[in-house]
Every structure is written in structure tokens, then in C-alpha cells.
Amino acid sequence: MNRFTTSQGAFELARFPEHPRDPFRAWDAADDYLLQQLTDPGTGPVDLSGTVAVVGDRWGALATALAAHRPVQISDSYLARRATLANLARNGIDEDAVRLLSSRDTPPDRIDVLLVRVPKSLAFLEDQLHRLAPAVHSGTVVIGTGMVKEIHTSTLKIFERIIGPTRTSLAVRKARLIFSTPDPALPRTLSPWPYRYELPADVGPVAGLTAVNHAGIFCAERLDIGTRFFLKHLPTRSGAVRVVDLGCGNGVLGLSAAVANPDAHLTFVDESYGAVASAEETFRAGAPAGAKADFLVGDGLADLDPGSVDLVLNNPPFHSHLATTDATARTMFAGAKTALRRGGELWVVGNRHLSYHTHLRRIFGNCTTVAGDPKFVVLRAVKR
């Protein structure tokens, strides 16, 4: 937990889930710069009396600081939502002060102030601006914020194409602001997302089926090479086993398990609302008739009963925004051990340099290498 002092007040903030030894803060200079801009006497304070929409607030720092203005927070991240609720409570703020919407929810009809934390994915930025543009009017104040290394010419072009004329601020503490002036004359076009592609011929049971990808999921325009390698080495199971695609992305791992064993009961889990929507559409498009599946947006396997799962398939992320970390993978591995029955198995694909085998041996007491190439390795751990 750390203290965030702004012109709106001082707040105690933490990421979610909170880890006592987590070196990363729940806010950064880009959040601070944006909040300063809203009260800058040089440009005149921004009128926050109308509908304020905060998009992509990573850990609730912006929503918490602006809670007095009853903002709408729009996020693709379940963990960001939980962080926001926890940070509001931590600072004695009623959770009803912030209206929480997911990236898949219908946005407000009218937005008077649109504050955008620039995401890593330009596709996600494009999709969200397309969805929000109908609510923007000629008087809407539109401000984006991000670290300098997150904002590129391509970022500005997206704002300009969808919202209107766009300029940037000077950099302050390696953060920069984006100012867009809404142009009502711009044509209102639909988002090009989701994107669909046919799975290649060398990936086992799902070859030739369709993957559906909403904006913002990892490697949304093609099958990522780690998943492609994993698909060639997935375990085979028969009967009414329960299989979880953990951190499912577009769901092709779980789909492969369902196609290979139509009697299996699949559960797709991700903390991204867009990912779970992608997985559900991928499954509906390619699964055998009668195949059974659940789709959960959540914090790993926390919502599953302990000892209820036979097989977990996992391609864990190793980035948290711009930071490289194995914390998410370790949390997923520990959650998988809890969710698995005795004799149940966790299968993982990862880059060789991440050394996931050390974490699996520590958590499960065992780890076997199933397959590998110069870049990737498929690992198997069994709950004893």
C-alpha cells in the first residue's frame, strides 16, 4: 500500500490482490499528471459537474481521487474493478460513489468529461473510443494520459480519427497528456472488433476452426506462437472430466479439449471481460453439439470449489502493463493446486527463460517436462 497525494486529496492505495512485498505502486506519474490538469489554475479547472467517464483506470487511483464527482469507471479488468472497490473502502468512500462498468457493458448515453488511461493495446483503445464516441458531444472535455513510452504517433492518430483534432502536452516526470477536441462532423463508424481468423492446420483438433478475438486480448490478430506450440502437445482425456482453461484469452486451448473430448465440462476463466467474451464466442463457433462450458470473469480459480477440477490448462501472462513479473503465474499455479483433485494435473506452456519449473516444483512438489523447443516448454505438475 502507498500514499497518493493529489490536488483532490491524499489517498492510501494498493493493487489487487494486495501482496505485502509487491514493489509496484497502484498509481504512477500519468495518473498524477491527469489529476493535476483537472485543477490547473493556468488552464482553468475542468468542470466535473456532468458525467465523468474514466476509461482504463488500472488500479482505481483515478476513480478514487475523483469519487466526489461520482464518475463512471469503464474497465476491461476484473482485478482493476476489485482494486477500485478495495481502494474506495480503504479511504472510507462509499462504493456507490463510482459506477463500475466493464468494457462489454453499454456505455453512458452522454459523457461530459472523458478521461482515458492509454492502454498497451492500440486495438483496445480503438475499440473503446468507437464505443464511447456516440456519447461524446462538442463540449466534451477529452483528456488521455500515459507514460511517454506508451504514447506514440499511432496513439494520437486513433484519437484524431475517432474523436477529433488532437495534441499532446509537454512531458512531466516521463508522463504525457493527450487533448482531443470533439469534432461532431466526423462519421460515426462501428468498431472493427471482434476479429476472426481460421486456426492453422498444424494445431490438432481445432485446425480449421474459427478463433474470435475482441480487442485487447493478447495477440488478437493471429494465434500466438506459445499457444500454437501448446496445442500440439495437449493431454488427451476421456469421459466427464472437468477441464479449466485458466487465463483463457480467446479460449482455443479449452476449445481443443472440448473437441477432443465432447464429454468434458469446460470452464473458461480470465480477468479480462473481453477475453471471456472472446472465449465464449470461439467456443460457440467451434465446439461439438452438446458440449458443456462455463465462462467466468474472475481472479484466477478463486471462485471454483477446492478439489473439483481434473485438468488445468494454462498459458500464463508475464507482463503487468509495462512491468515483467512472474507474480501472476505463481498465483495461478497455487490456485490450480487448490482447485485440482488429487491426481489432477496442471499443464503449462511458457518461455524457457521464465523458469516456471522452479515454481511448480515448489508448489506441487513435482514437475515434468512434456515438450520443448528452443523458445518454449510445456510442463506438467500433478497434485499428490
From Swiss-Prot:
Catalysis performed (reactions): guanosine(1835) in 23S rRNA + S-adenosyl-L-methionine = N(2)-methylguanosine(1835) in 23S rRNA + S-adenosyl-L-homocysteine + H(+)
Location within or outside the cell:
Cytoplasm
- Does rRNA processing appear among the keywords? yes
Q: Which Gene3D superfamilies match?
A: Vaccinia Virus protein VP39 (3.40.50.150)
One short Pfam name that applies is MTS
| Disulfide cross-links | none
Q: Which HAMAP family match?
A: 23SrRNA_methyltr_G
- PANTHER family associated with the record: RIBOSOMAL RNA LARGE SUBUNIT METHYLTRANSFERASE G, RIBOSOMAL RNA SMALL SUBUNIT METHYLTRANSFERASE C
What is the protein name for this chain? Answer: Ribosomal RNA large subunit methyltransferase G
Whose protein is this, by species? Answer: Streptomyces griseus subsp. griseus (strain JCM 4626 / CBS 651.72 / NBRC 13350 / KCC S-0626 / ISP 5235)
* Upper lineage: Bacteria, Bacillati, Actinomycetota, Actinomycetes, Kitasatosporales
Q: Which gene specifies this protein's sequence?
A: rlmG
